[in-house]
């Protein structure tokens, strides 16, 4: 069971929060200013956050570089357009995955896309490389930067996973997304973050991916084209505005992203696709089972079959594998056949020494 923080406030403090949060029918509230678009489609407003998701090597960081270059220059880059107010022109770029050398390559790429000189630091862009710090310290540094940088309008966080110790922790995920909502509202900024997708499906990874899907203004997917591996395709998978037409880009000889103007979006097939019976041995990657079973048996052995099936649905769901009852039964059969789960009397027990 995950611990939850207990907030103890005085009645006066709670009353002040209530007053701040009360909506009045006679008051005037401004619509969130639009700051990022793809063509004529809104993907980002001040006071909200968005995300890019994609599998490894799908060119997510190249895509984000184009977003930043558009915001930095105020021009169209790839298909991104930006219109940040004059008092919201500062950009904070957080990289949690790469070292200083590779972060500098990203910075130079952004400047070239924005037609700015590489010989001096840009006035409106600050990049922080936080790879060496712990998740808790990374979060504290970002919170300090967001609160201290004047005229801040756009924050890039590449990637959000490195703010968490456990990507499947519901409490950690809720805390991070709550921070995003607080920062964007208090500072009236837009945050764009990056998260990997599961290897075996299109879902954003872990519980943090679920929280992003539920709360983000826009989720864009960056995917390598199935017919041409040199091309990456960007499309909206969750969006409050109307969907934009998917577009494609490739990396040219100068290691810069450039649009593929000849790309034609694939037609989405209507109706339910034909699919054979569920085969967990083939459809669930081997490396998913151990973390899933760690979650299933987190509280020890399970004595009831129905409880066991429900826990399988929950444990595999945390790994991005959605199971209904019938599929969970097939998974239970596989686990028994492979001696990954064994019977101890009437109990179901995890066998950590299994070989698969």
PLM region descriptions:
Residues 51-57, 62, 171-258:
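Phosphate-binding/switch region of NTP-binding enzymes
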Residues 61, 136-139, 170-174, 325, ...:
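Non-membrane alpha-helical structural segments and their capping/turn regions in soluble enzymes
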């Amino acid at each position: 069971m995950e611990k939850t923080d207990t907030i103890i406030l005085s009645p006066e403090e709670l009353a002040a929060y209530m007053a701040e949060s009360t909506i009045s029918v006679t008051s005037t509230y401004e619509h969130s200013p639009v700051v990022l678009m793809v063509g004529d489609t809104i993907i980002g407003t001040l006071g909200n956050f968005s995300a890019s998701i994609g599998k490894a090597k799908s060119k997510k960081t190249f895509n984000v570089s184009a977003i930043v270059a558009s915001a930095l220059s105020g021009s169209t880059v790839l298909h991104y357009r930006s219109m940040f107010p004059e008092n919201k022109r500062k950009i904070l770029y957080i990289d949690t995955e790469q070292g200083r050398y590779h972060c500098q390559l990203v910075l130079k790429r952004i400047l070239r896309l924005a037609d700015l000189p590489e010989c001096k630091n840009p006035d409106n862009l600050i990049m922080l490389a936080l790879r060496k710090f712990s998740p808790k310290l990374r979060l504290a540094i970002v919170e300090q930067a967001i609160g201290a940088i004047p005229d801040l309008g756009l924050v890039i966080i590449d990637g959000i996973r490195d703010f968490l110790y456990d990507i499947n922790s519901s409490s950690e995920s809720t805390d991070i997304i709550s921070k995003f909502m607080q920062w964007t509202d208090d500072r009236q900024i837009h945050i764009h973050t990056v998260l990997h997708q599961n290897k075996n499906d299109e879902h954003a990874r872990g519980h943090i991916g679920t929280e992003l899907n539920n709360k983000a203004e826009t989720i864009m997917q960056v995917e390598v084209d199935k017919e041409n591996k040199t091309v990456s395709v960007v499309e909206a998978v969750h969006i409050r505005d109307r969907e934009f037409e998917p577009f494609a880009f490739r990396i040219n000889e100068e290691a810069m992203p450039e649009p593929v103007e000849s790309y034609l979006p694939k037609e989405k097939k209507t109706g339910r696709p034909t699919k054979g019976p569920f085969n967990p041995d083939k459809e669930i990657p081997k490396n998913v089972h151990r973390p899933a079973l760690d979650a299933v048996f987190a509280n020890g052995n399970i004595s009831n079959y129905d409880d066991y099936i429900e826990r399988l649905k929950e444990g595999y769901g945390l790994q991005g594998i959605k199971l209904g009852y019938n599929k969970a039964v097939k998974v239970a059969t596989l686990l028994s056949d492979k001696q990954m789960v064994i019977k101890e009397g009437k109990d179901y027990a995890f066998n950590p020494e299994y070989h698969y």
